[in-house]
A protein has these predicted regions:
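Patatin-like phospholipase
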Residues: 1-246
Length: 246
């Protein structure tokens, strides 16, 4: 891991960046937490500090920084928001990789945005490249969903009004649609029902999940696909839905 990081990390580029960096770790030798910002990391020690911040000695326990033992900072603070508050940041976005609640100081004038995963991310012992890429994409798109108020549960749709969705079906046809496809929990709105059904169709046709979709263009794509899949249980839904451009 050390050789991998040393090969791929460009410390000069890291230090020239105007974006600050903060991390925490735990010094097992001295039995104390360590919190550092970019300026606190000694020259030439970036790789060691990064390794210490995520070190879990399941297979091998070795000294990392200055001949001392370190372990993942999560053993004392799995989301070190307080160090950012103490540094003077007044608006903080927290992207969690876990579902449990985080604890931090509540100070007047400090705004904390919490963005958590909507699904189980699996064990921290899962080190596959495929799994890591999935988690990064999920975190990125869930953040976009939060920032831009996107619609969708598993997928990401541009936000359209409730009124927009009421125009997508003729009233007579819509009654049949509801009866045919609303087999689960009753939706609160037409928008909720239609989006829920569209997501099921996207899953059936293996539509790429990590992308922001404008509904008219997505529906056009689904209509093209459904013409060759008349046996699909969603054929009647897609056939009758209208494509409404803003």
């Amino acid at each position: 891991m050390k050789n991998f990081l040393a090969h791929h990390l460009k410390e000069k580029t890291f230090r020239r960046s105007k974006i600050d960096f903060a991390m925490n770790t735990y010094n097992l030798t001295d039995r104390c937490p360590v919190e550092v910002f970019k300026k606190d990391i000694p020259e030439g020690k970036l790789v060691e500090y990064l390794m210490s911040s995520a070190y879990l000695p399941f297979f091998k326990f070795e000294k990392i920084i200055d001949n001392k033992y370190y372990i993942d900072g999560g053993v004392y603070s799995d989301c070190p928001v307080d160090m950012l508050i103490d540094a003077g940041y007044d608006e903080i976005y927290v992207i969690k990789a876990f579902k449990k609640r985080i604890r931090y100081k509540h100070k007047k004038g400090i705004k904390i945005h919490i963005i958590g995963p909507r699904e189980n991310l699996g064990s921290i012992m899962s080190f596959t490249q495929e799994g890591a890429k999935f988690k990064m994409k999920l975190g990125y798109y869930d953040t976009l969903k939060y920032l831009y108020n996107l619609d969708g549960n598993k997928y990401y749709f541009k936000n359209y009004s409730e009124e927009y969705y009421t125009k997508l079906f003729d009233k007579r046809v819509y009654k049949k649609i509801i009866k045919e496809y609303d087999k689960g929990i009753l939706p609160k709105t037409d928008k909720e029902f239609i989006l829920r059904t569209i997501e099921k169709i996207c899953k059936e046709f293996k539509i790429e999940r990590f992308r922001i979709y404008k509904l008219p263009y997505l529906l056009t794509r689904l209509k093209n696909k459904i013409t060759n899949n008349k046996e699909s249980k969603y054929y009647y839904f897609i056939k009758n839905i209208k494509i409404e451009f803003e």
